[in-house]
Amino acid sequence: MKNIRNFSIIAHIDHGKSTLSDRLIQTCGGLSDREMEAQVLDSMDLERERGITIKAQSVTLNYKAKNGETYQLNFIDTPGHVDFSYEVSRSLAACEGALLVVDAGQGVEAQTLANCYTAIEMNLEVVPILNKIDLPAADPERVAEEIEDIVGIDAMEAVRCSAKTGVGIEDVLEEIVAKIPAPKGDPNAPLQALIIDSWFDNYLGVVSLVRVKNGVLRKGDKIKVMSTGQTYNVDRLGIFTPKQVDKNELECGEVGWVVCAIKDILGAPVGDTLTSQHNPASSVLPGFKKVKPQVYAGLFPVSSDDYEAFRDALGKLSLNDASLFYEPETSTALGFGFRCGFLGLLHMEIIQERLEREYDLDLITTAPTVVYEVELTNGDVIYVDSPSKLPPLNNISEIREPIAECNMLVPQEYLGNVITLCVEKRGVQTNMVYHGNQIALTYEIPMGEVVLDFFDRLKSTSRGYASLDYSFKRFQAADMVRVDIMINGERVDALALIVHKDNAPYRGRELVEKMKELIPRQQFDIAIQAAIGNHIIARSTVKQLRKNVLAKCYGGDVSRKKKLLQKQKEGKKRMKQLGNVEVPQEAFLAILHVGKDSK
């Protein structure tokens, strides 16, 4: 056990985590050169296309160190994007150490900081590593100072390497063996194993990734899931070298996968503890805090026949992604669907894309909203995650919106642009610290403004150099109103949105104009209105198409023409009473893009 090392790799987006993992696997001979491909651990097609890591993956490698001993390295590659920080905290719960990878050209960024603090809070040994030293822009000395200054860990001795060219990879491995402590645990104690991740395999059922903290997990054991008390038989277990390799037992301190023929998706929740049935452990391992979704949106299948398939797909996906929340919802415009909770917009996009690809569904998404705390006139407090659930205005005493604390690292030359953006998003500055050329800014910005398009706008105003990390701070009273969109006098529930009163006329007008372009013309006028309660704040009309009924009248009497026009008018009137308007899919997506192009 003294030769086991469990560690994660944490870093900002694009600082080279996945490439470093590739090199470690290659150096330790986990895969032959023929099987090696770039980003070997990013197994989803989506991860490869976007070039980001979404799911944490684990690998077990054997490394023969310079002192002649062979060490077993279990490492977990983690995502860097702010929406997936829960994946990082799950991976860290299974480790004793973490490699903090920093790009020697870019330096420290917000995510580097956030993930590093998570690791330090969990009492892990953090080993700094400067990557990409082969770049002409690399300045390892400056970056090492930056790490000491901003993060506050000793980085003068940090290993300098280049994952792309393979320089310094041996030093990284030696550093892991020297600096990261061996796992603590008692092989003779009752079994305790932490479930780090689970996913659904069509042949094996539920596969769980576990870290054995105490005791030994053997094939054929009867095990018990501590939170549900259900017992299962261990059918197969083993490790990833990235390939799935079967073993007969997982020893204390090891990380591996387990299959116990669990058919039920909720059978082995992530963060739970496995123990043996005959000699159960007395206490549960401390898991990790459940993450609260920050953004809610309605997802509806385009054809209602897909509802069952959609429900199954969500179940399977939520097993693999513990932070996805969903509950059934009905909408008068869109039929049956689900209200889903996500960690951010990227998370929402990825879930939607995974549902469409992996499960072959066609979905409509409604506009994302955040959760509001609403105090009613009778003193009750309710939480509203969808505009259609907001009670009538005269029953509400106040609405409180969620405020996010945003930590940004910005180069000096873009400071002005970023501050302007934050003010426009109703932000309040709480702190500002200079670190050399970088400035650490702290703002409190309403969550509703952050989740919509703040990240994209921040990147574009700073040419991609500013970085962001945000977390929920508190609820704060604000003047929020619900804007309803009415088409021909009928409210379309899926298009409603909750906005700040000052922005309402402007958002309403923009949305109405956008809808006008998207709704196809009919034989009669279509009125599109935005309203707060009964007060109309914006209107626009999609003009009717009309046939020239006088074409056949060459000369003729004026009364004849009047008669024909009158007849047409009556027909249109009758049509307008009976006609209903089809709202195309693009119109629902229009809400997302309001305010983006106009600025």
From Swiss-Prot:
Stretches assigned to coiled coil: none
Matching SUPFAM superfamilies: EF-G C-terminal domain-like, P-loop containing nucleoside triphosphate hydrolases
Alphabetical UniProt keywords: Cell inner membrane, Cell membrane, GTP-binding, Hydrolase, Membrane, Nucleotide-binding, Protein biosynthesis
Catalytic activity: GTP + H2O = GDP + phosphate + H(+)
Gene Ontology molecular function terms on file: GTP binding; GTPase activity; guanosine tetraphosphate binding; ribosome binding; translation elongation factor activity
Gene3D superfamilies per UniProt: 3.30.70.240, Elongation factor 4, C-terminal domain, Elongation Factor G (Translational Gtpase), domain 3, P-loop containing nucleotide triphosphate hydrolases, Translation factors
The keyword DNA damage is assigned to this record: no
CDD domains: EF4_II, EF4_III, LepA, lepA_C
One GO-annotated biological process of the protein: positive regulation of translation
Subcellular location: Cell inner membrane
HAMAP family cross-referenced by the UniProt entry: LepA
Record function comment: Required for accurate and efficient protein synthesis under certain stress conditions. May act as a fidelity factor of the translation reaction, by catalyzing a one-codon backward translocation of tRNAs on improperly translocated ribosomes. Back-translocation proceeds from a post-translocation (POST) complex to a pre-translocation (PRE) complex, thus giving elongation factor G a second chance to translocate the tRNAs correctly. Binds to ribosomes in a GTP-dependent manner.
Protein name: Elongation factor 4
Record organism: Mannheimia succiniciproducens (strain KCTC 0769BP / MBEL55E)
Gene name in the database record: lepA
